[in-house]
């Protein structure tokens, strides 16, 4: 099933799945980068469960955490990697790009952008995108590094973005892990 809810539409036009092959020819190196940063503020909902959207919002606003992510981006950039940075929030994409600075080839890939702007961003060495827009249907075979800048439980589609590579670098996934107990397993 597709996360975007279009499974029924595709099945209607194309019919049932005949065969499902999991492609295991390329396996990325996966690293967890532990920030040691706890969210400043947590809230619970009426039912007593943790308010995850608020928590993710607080993490994305953390200046110290964002500087740490940008430090990783700069390190991988210096290794001649083509980097996709995924996050849950549009504002986070914009803040990270601003912190990275103009000395680096970077672009934004978020919803509501015109096609020409998206295509231009897709040519950059660092692409900041939301999970939503880059999850299904996004293709850039030159990518070799994925940085998961905000917590996400299902990243299979996201990791697939760097497994279609056309360059010499091995695929690399860097998961930014925060020490808050709920987020460690995401």
Regions found by a protein language model. Name each.
Residues 4-7, 66-70, 140, 152-156:
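Amphipathic alpha-helical transducer elements in NTP-driven molecular machines
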Residues 105-107, 111-186:
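Conserved RecA-like P-loop NTPase helicase motor core
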Residues 10, 96-100, 137, 158:
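Hydrophobic packing residues within well-ordered alpha-helices of enzyme cores
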Residues 31-36, 84-88, 108-111, 128-129:
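Short, conserved beta-strand edge motifs with alternating hydrophobic and charged residues
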Residues 89-92, 132-134:
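Alpha-helix capping/helix-boundary segments
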Residues 44-88, 94-99:
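Conserved interdomain hinge at the start of the Helicase C-terminal
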Residues 1-32:
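Post-DEXD/H (motif II) to motif III coupling segment of the RecA-like Helicase ATP-binding lobe
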Residues 1, 91, 178-182:
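Short histidine/acidic/glycine/proline-rich micro-motifs that form metal-
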């Amino acid at each position: 099933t597709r996360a975007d809810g279009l499974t029924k539409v595709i099945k209607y036009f194309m019919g049932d799945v005949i065969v499902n092959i999991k492609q295991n020819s390329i396996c990325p190196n996966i690293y967890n980068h532990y920030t040691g940063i706890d969210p400043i503020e947590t809230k619970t909902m009426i039912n007593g469960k943790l308010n995850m959207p608020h928590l993710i919002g607080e993490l994305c606003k953390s200046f110290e955490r964002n500087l740490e992510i940008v430090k990783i981006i700069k390190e991988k950039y210096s290794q001649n990697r083509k980097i996709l940075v995924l996050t849950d929030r549009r504002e986070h994409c914009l803040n990270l790009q601003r912190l990275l600075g103009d000395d680096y080839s970077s672009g934004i890939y978020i919803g509501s952008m015109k096609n020409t702007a998206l295509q231009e961003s897709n040519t950059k060495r660092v692409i900041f995108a939301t999970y939503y827009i880059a999850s299904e249907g996004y293709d850039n075979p030159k990518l070799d590094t994925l940085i998961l800048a905000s917590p996400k439980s299902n990243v299979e589609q996201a990791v697939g973005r760097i497994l279609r590579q056309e360059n010499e670098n091995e695929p690399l996934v860097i998961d930014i892990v925060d020490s808050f107990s709920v987020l460690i397993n995401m």
